[in-house]
Amino acid sequence: MTTAEPSNPVPVDATPGPIYIDTQHEDMVHDAQMDYYGSKLATCSSDRTIKIYNVSENAYELSATIQGGHEGPVWQVSWAHPKFGVLLASCSFDGSVLLHQEVRPREWTVIHAARHLHESSVNGVAFAPHEHGLLVAAASSDGRVSVLQHEAANNTWGVHYLTDCPLGVNAVSWAPWGAFYQADQVEAPRLVTAGCDNQIRFWIYQEGQWTTDSSIVLDVTEVAHKDWVRDVAWAPVLLPNHNMVASCSEDGSVIVWTQVPPANVDGDENTQESFSQWKPTLLHKFDAPVWRVSWSVTGHFLAVSAGDSDVTLWKAGLDGAWSQVSTVDAQSTSQGQ
C-alpha cells in the first residue's frame, strides 16, 4: 500500500555543505539511494516501510510512503534506469524482493512480488546496467544470489540462482557497461559479491548460465579481509579493462581492488592473456566495522560509512595512494538536525 503525502516542501540551509533530511521513519534507516536524475531519494528502514522524497538543491518533500509490502526490516533499495520507468527494487529480512513502480505522481504499486525468493534474509539488491535489459540481482544469507529477469514478450519474470558462499552473501554489485572489451564479442553481464567467508567473488553470465569468472585472479598475498565482507561496489568505468572494485569488512578494512590490464602475449598487440590480475590496496583500517561503500558518478571519489557514525569521502592521488578529503560525523549531524 502507498500513502501519498501532502506537498509541503521543507526549505534547507543554502550554505554549502550536507543537507539533512528528517526521514520520519520509526526505526533504524538502513539505506538511502538517489535516482538516476538525482531528483528522488528512497530510504528504507526496520519499520518495514520505504519513503520517497522529491529533492532539490534548496528543498525536499516527502512524496510517498510505501508500506505493507514487506513483513520484516527492509535492508536495501535500488533504482532502475529511467528507460524502464520510475522503478524501485527493495529487499528484506523476509526473504523477498519487491519491485515498485510509480504509476502516477505520488502513487506507487508493486508490479512484481518475488516472495520467498530465498530461504533466508535478502541483504542486498541491485539493478543491472540497462544495456543488459531489465535484470535485478539479490544477495541472501542462504548463500545464494538470485537474478530476476523480465521477459518483455509475455511480461513475466524468470529467475537464475548462483550458489555463492555457504555462510551467506551480504551484498552484490554489477559491472558497468563497457567494463570489459574484447573485439567482436558482445559484453557479458558480470557480478561481484560480498561473502561471509571474508571474500569477494566475481561471476559472469555465459551460454545461458552464471559461472565463476575464471578470467579474474585476485592477489590476496598481502592484503585481504579478515572478517565478513559487508559491502562491495564496482566503480564506474572510464576506460575498458581499467576496473576498480571497493569492498568493506566487519574487521574495519576497506580495500580497493584494481585491475591490471591484460598483457600482450609474445609482443602481439592483437593477442592478450585470457585472464587479468587484480591488485588490492588498503584504503584505510577503521576502528569500527564498515557497513557501506559507494562511488561517485565519475568513480573518482569513494564514500565510506562506518560503525563510528562517520561518513568519509576518499580520493586517490596520482601515486595511487588514497587520502580522506571530507567527513560527515555524528556531531555535525546532530547540529544539522
Regions found by a protein language model. Give the residues of each.
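Intrinsically disordered, low-complexity acidic/Ser/Thr/Pro-rich linker and tail segments
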Residues: 1-31, 261-273, 330-337
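Beta-strand-rich domains and repeat architectures in extracellular enzymes and scaffolds
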Residues: 21-48
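WD40/WD-repeat beta-propeller blade N-cap
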Residues: 21-29, 66-74, 114-122, 162-169, ...
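Short coil/turn segments within WD40 beta-propeller repeats
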Residues: 27-30, 47-51, 72-75, 93-98, ...
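Loop/turn segments within WD40 beta-propeller blades
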Residues: 32-38, 78-85, 126-133, 173-188, ...
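Short loop/turn segments immediately following beta-strands, especially the blade-tip
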Residues: 54-58, 101-107, 149-156, 203-212, ...
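Solenoidal tandem-repeat scaffolds enriched in leucines and small polar residues
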Residues: 112-209
